[in-house]
Amino acid sequence: MSKIIGIDLGTTNSAVAVLEGTESKIIANPEGNRTTPSVVSFKNGEIIVGDAAKRQAVTNPDTVISIKSKMGTSEKVSANGKEYTPQEISAMILQYLKGYAEDYLGEKVTKAVITVPAYFNDAQRQATKDAGKIAGLEVXRIVNEPTAAALAYGLDKTDKEEKXXVFDLGGGTFDVSILELGDGVFDVLSTAGDNKLGGDDFDQKIIDHLVAEFKKENGIDLSTDKMAMQRLKDAAEKAKKDLSGVTSTQISLPFITAGEAGPLHLEMTLTRAKFDDLTRDLVERTKVPVRQALSDAGLSLSEIDEVILVGGSTRIPAVVEAVKAETGKEPNKSVNPDEVVAMGAAIQGGVITGDVKDVVLLDVTPLSLGIETMGGVFTKLIDRNTTIPTSKSQVFSTAADNQPAVDIHVLQGERPMAADNKTLGRFQLTDIPAAPRGIPQIEVTFDIDKNGIVSVKAKDLGTQKEQTIVIQSNSGLTDEEIDRMMKDAEANAEADKKRKEEVDLRNEVDQAIFATEKTIKETEGKGFDAERDAAQAALDDLKKAQEDNNLDDMKAKLEALNEKAQGLAVKLYEQAAAAQQAQEGAEGAQATGNAGDDVVDGEFTEK
């Protein structure tokens, strides 16, 4: 069975890992980095992903960042003169991760385990699965990020029972999960979180502060200048990271804008104390889900054995202090917060392929599921933190006499009224026989699969007629749309491959021309004119093909030049070797002669 890669598709950064033997290994990207920025940019028809895309974000307006925050919505992004769904942009990131994983493994990758925040709703999970499909990946499992982290943390501790709180603060989302680990079973007891809280919000606090201070000093509002704002974002992210290690950092942005008197520069010192003050409300927001998760798990703080930090934003000192204060425990720092989620996903991939034995993952649904009933009430069928996969049925009836159909309004959330919760979908059960209200028996069944994706069935117990839907939110893609996007993604991948081959060929041609010209110059007057003339003719042919920009001709002429240049190089080598041999022979003869000169006659006297 081929490898199933593990992917942490993050808001700010993404990572990919694979199981090698019993060890989960992060795969470095082509630039040698173990995480890849979740950034996509478009330039001259080319799709650029990762570090290269992030580097040009300041100057390229066709750059998309933090697309994960839009997953599960109908919102689209405009770039490259087109509109893209969040699934399509995410697929470009996944395709890039898949590509360099294939280069590392030396084989095609078709399956992946992809992680999502524990608090992702059904629409967001479905969107993630669709993104995988567009990227040419079969998503064998969607795993909650804190659960994946626990898998990576706890794999070597499966013989020891313990309860762990996973505190996961990423670039755009925040989750807390309480798990019980023991005998190879990873049992999620509860999860809570905030899908609108992450490192991006901490960056934004710094940006807002810089904009306000600059306006106060210079009377210019930088928030209306797109390029200045991108530079501020980069500077804010760097300052945030710096302040995890030092107590003060200098923010210097020369030529940030121009005033009446000429160019203006932004120079500011940001202390950790000021940063803590700016972000105090964000840190406070992390405390409520911790309490909620503990309460839902029915545990007290003293029953938690380990607190595991996940996500780059957990490096912020104020966040670490808040975790200590809230849990009364020193967080466990034995795992890399940027890499542990992808590593856990790869372990789950190993569980699926059978490479990892005796490990069972029991995850939960993060939000309650139910339907709207009479009076706009939200009636729950499955409570939050129910272990998945699961199925639950309940019988309802009609609200009016001779009602021919019932509308099933499927919802997810915790509020008592339907209007205050998230609509997952609607469908209708028709052809109900005429009867007084309350008589027809309509059985509604909810199914949640191992990926947390919901399907709902309504059945008239009188006629046995039933209607089933897999939930498609208003952001959901049809099979036709996914197929079209898959074809686009494949076409782009092929175009990117051809473009890379073209660049590699041009580089080879330049290198060959340079090397051959050097060799021809070095061999001047050394007696092998025939080889030099042949190499020069091949060199001229290649230069002509390069001028004509004929790729096929360049390829053929490059091969011809390499052959002629090799012949010339062999002659040069043979001549150098012969000269070396002659020199060694002469030195040997001289040494022998000198040895004779050094002989001294000695007198021997007998005693």
Curated annotation (Swiss-Prot):
A GO term for molecular function: unfolded protein binding
Tagged with keyword Metal-binding: no
Coiled coil: none
Induction trigger: By stress conditions e.g. heat shock.
Gene3D superfamilies: 1.20.1270.10, 3.30.420.40, Actin, Chain A, domain 4, Substrate Binding Domain Of DNAk, Chain A, domain 1
Compositionally biased residues, Acidic residues: 598-607
Keywords, sorted A to Z: ATP-binding, Chaperone, Nucleotide-binding, Phosphoprotein, Stress response
Phosphothreonine sites (modified residues): T173
Pfam families hit by this protein: HSP70
Region entry Disordered, spans: 579-607
Segments of skewed composition (Low complexity): 579-591
Listed InterPro entries: ATPase_NBD, Chaperone_DnaK, Heat_shock_70_CS, HSP70_C_sf, HSP70_peptide-bd_sf, Hsp_70_fam
Function, in words: Acts as a chaperone.
Stated family: Belongs to the heat shock protein 70 family.
Name of protein: Chaperone protein DnaK
Designated gene of the protein: dnaK
